[in-house]
């Protein structure tokens, strides 16, 4: 029997799709950071519902380049009959979601997350409800930016759900290695190291921005990059 049979998971995507990269390509939600966790949760027995702030999504241009797809990702990307697409095309907007119906929330990344998730008040409300009801909040790469903006309803001081938690995410060293830190700065955006420091979290840098690296602190589970998508999703299942 599947370990999560009868349980429900929310898989969160950014709704933003637009200019970001120095080469003129657009950012959106990262393809493999949606697909890989979806596969983990389905195998574990979860009912999976995709959601974004306004019910729309588009993939980050670089994340669907042929050279960026592994064998599994390429197979699913080219097979539009795969149930991944059926479920993805049933994406809901956050205002239509009842958070208490879900035991786990996972946020995919892509730099797009930095554009809309800090202001995605409906997604933040859903995440808060999942957390209040004892659910797991998990995210990978740039997805953790949502968690840094979710207030803990049990905190009278209005602290975030990541306050005094050990977290990780795509860090400043990674942005610099990609050559996009200046792209963030000129849009008035900070690195995730800075964002989590302001949210009262303890940010744990990976030994290298490109390695598989995950942090688990109670019901808060975070990962660094696409390489960490599988391990972060698996850790979220275990945390539940």
Curated annotation (Swiss-Prot):
Transmembrane segments: none annotated. Keywords: Cytoplasm, Lyase, Nucleus, Stress response. The active site is at 141, 142, 175. InterPro entries: Class_I_gatase-like, DJ-1/PfpI, Prot/Nucl_acid_deglycase. GO terms for biological process: cellular detoxification; methylglyoxal catabolic process to D-lactate via S-lactoyl-glutathione. GO terms for molecular function: glyoxalase III activity. Its EC number is 4.2.1.130. This is Glutathione-independent glyoxalase hsp3102. The lineage of its organism: Eukaryota, Fungi, Dikarya, Ascomycota, Taphrinomycotina.
């Amino acid at each position: 029997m599947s370990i999560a049979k009868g349980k429900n998971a929310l898989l969160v995507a950014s709704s933003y799709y637009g200019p970001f990269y120095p080469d003129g390509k657009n950012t959106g939600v990262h393809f493999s950071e949606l697909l890989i966790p979806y596969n983990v949760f389905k195998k574990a027995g979860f009912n999976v519902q995709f959601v974004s702030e306004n019910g729309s999504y588009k993939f980050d241009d670089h994340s669907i380049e042929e050279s960026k797809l592994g064998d599994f990702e390429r197979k699913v990307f080219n097979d539009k009959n795969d149930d991944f697409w059926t479920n993805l095309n049933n994406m809901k907007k956050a205002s239509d979601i009842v958070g208490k119906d879900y035991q786990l929330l996972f946020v995919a990344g892509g730099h797009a997350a930095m554009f809309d998730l800090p202001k995605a008040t409906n997604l933040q409300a859903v995440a808060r409800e999942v957390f209040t009801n004892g659910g797991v909040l998990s995210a990978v790469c740039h997805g953790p930016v949502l968690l840094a903006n979710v207030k803990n309803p049990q905190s009278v001081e209005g602290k975030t759900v990541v306050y005094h938690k050990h977290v990780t995410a795509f860090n400043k060293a990674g942005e610099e290695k990609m050559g996009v830190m200046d792209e963030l700065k000129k849009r008035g955006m900070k690195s995730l190291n800075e964002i989590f420091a302001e949210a009262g979290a303890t940010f744990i840098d990976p030994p290298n921005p490109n390695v598989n690296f995950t942090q688990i602190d109670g019901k808060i589970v975070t990962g660094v990059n696409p390489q960490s998508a599988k391990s972060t999703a698996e850790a979220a299942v275990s945390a539940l």
